[in-house]
Amino acid sequence: MKGDIGMGLIKAVAGAVGGTMADQWKEFFYCEAMDKNVMVRKGQKQTSSRSSNTKGNDNIITNGSGIAVADGQCMIIVEQGKVVEICAESGQFTYDTSTEPSIFSGNLGDSISKTFATIGKRFTFGGDTGKDQRVYYFNTKELIDNKFGTPNPIPFRVVDSKIGLDIDVAVRCSGVYSYRISDPLLFYTNVCGNVENEYTREEIDRQLKTEF
């Protein structure tokens, strides 16, 4: 029994130290151009074969990391399920309010002390981060070419007493519409929430067509 406890403690400490050190590398988040079917996409860390930042937690944003926002996109940062940042202006930005401090940012002494405090916090979670930070990109371009139509003819009675008309007809309706996300914050809060990778318009089109 003692051996099992000791192994658990060693593993937790190793996980806490290793995970925290891996998360010290600054990230660069970006989102490739989204096609007309994608409404929301989770931000990806830019890595290459030469990158040393390959073991960090996917849901941790290190202090000082870069975040790029392209035209036609809106970016939000979600921490512990709550939106803490939103940006709809294109350009590159630096994340400097993270509660996951980096030894590569700010005052070296302060950052190191905060990092060791973070290691202590992770130890209480068995070596895991105990934190969730995500970057989401919203497609703010107009989503066009959405077709709709009545699945069955709609019966309709036409009556005109002046000419003695009283007939039953069947009416069909079809067309094309477009829409766009005008408030990404409300869309995240009320519609998509946290998504693993992408939220596509197929997930909402049925509801939209029903309301027609």
Residue ranges and their predicted role:
Residues 2-212:
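N-terminal hydrophobic membrane-entry segments
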